[in-house]
């Protein structure tokens, strides 16, 4: 994932050293994930350079060998694009708590990337009956004009039911921003889900309409790292978030994808094998 320039700690070794000094000042040797006041450590402001600098490769997803994938890194996110579906396989990005406080204006300037094979045009969605649904939402890219512009690339877009886009999916996106502020940073991976029955296509480019959408969340900087996944059908969906929640392992069985293969094995097992919506929704 492209590195965003921030001041502060530049490596995990520096991070450990700085935290060790802080912990010794508390009068006790504590684990890396502890703090003097028993709250989750804060990596915001000048002490957070972005989680992918400390856990390299979190944006990487291992896909089935027979699935076409063209990877491209944009300013604030990474896309795996599928030229057959004319939609992304997935879009991955980190969201820092401080970034959601910024106020770069939304552009709505959708554009076709000539470097992406099969990237559709915004006209392919015109009068299709579907929204141009962002996988990485514009509201997550308000920290940079360039990131905001990149967010409107058509490679980041899928045909999405309007009531889902403006309803339950939007509710989840808003909740993610709250969680990012609370947890200092979260990793997000989102994309469409297709089955053999999903044969509908729109526009001259024949953009394939997905039957559902998935989202994977990881909070690695809390006292007990946690993960969760969601699957929403591409239709009007009741706004009851926990009904769409599942473990990351469950989603991996559905998609055939391997999320967060760069994590240490034990940590990956911990965050992927189970989930607690209550912990995500209520943790302080």
Could you describe each region identified by the protein language model?
Residues 2-284:
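Domain-level detector for secreted/extracellular nuclease and nuclease-toxin modules, and
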């Amino acid at each position: 994932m492209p590195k965003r320039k921030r001041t502060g700690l530049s490596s995990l070794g520096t991070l450990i050293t700085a935290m060790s000094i802080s912990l010794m000042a508390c009068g006790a040797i504590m684990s890396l994930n502890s703090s003097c006041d028993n709250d989750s450590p804060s990596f915001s402001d000048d002490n957070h350079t972005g989680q992918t600098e400390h856990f390299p490769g979190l944006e990487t997803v291992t896909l089935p060998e027979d699935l076409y994938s063209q990877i491209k890194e944009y300013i604030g996110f990474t896309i795996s694009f599928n030229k057959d579906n004319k939609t992304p396989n997935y879009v991955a990005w980190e969201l820092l708590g401080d970034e959601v406080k910024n106020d770069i204006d939304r552009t709505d300037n959708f554009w076709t990337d000539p470097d992406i094979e099969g990237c559709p045009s915004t006209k392919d969605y015109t009068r299709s009956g579907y929204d141009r649904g962002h996988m990485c939402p514009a509201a997550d890219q308000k920290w940079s004009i360039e990131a905001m512009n990149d967010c409107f690339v058509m490679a980041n877009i899928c045909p999405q039911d309007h009531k889902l886009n403006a309803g339950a999916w939007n509710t989840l996106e808003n909740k993610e921003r709250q969680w990012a502020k609370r947890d200092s940073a979260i990793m997000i991976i989102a994309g469409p889900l297709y089955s053999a029955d999903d044969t509908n296509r729109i526009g001259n480019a024949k953009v394939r309409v997905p039957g559902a959408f998935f989202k994977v969340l990881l909070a690695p900087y809390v006292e007990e790292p946690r993960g969760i996944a969601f699957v929403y059908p591409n239709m009007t969906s009741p706004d009851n978030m926990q009904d769409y929640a599942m473990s990351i392992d469950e989603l991996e069985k559905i998609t055939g994808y391997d999320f967060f293969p760069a994590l240490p094995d034990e940590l990956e097992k911990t965050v992927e094998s189970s989930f607690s919506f209550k912990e995500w929704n209520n943790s302080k």
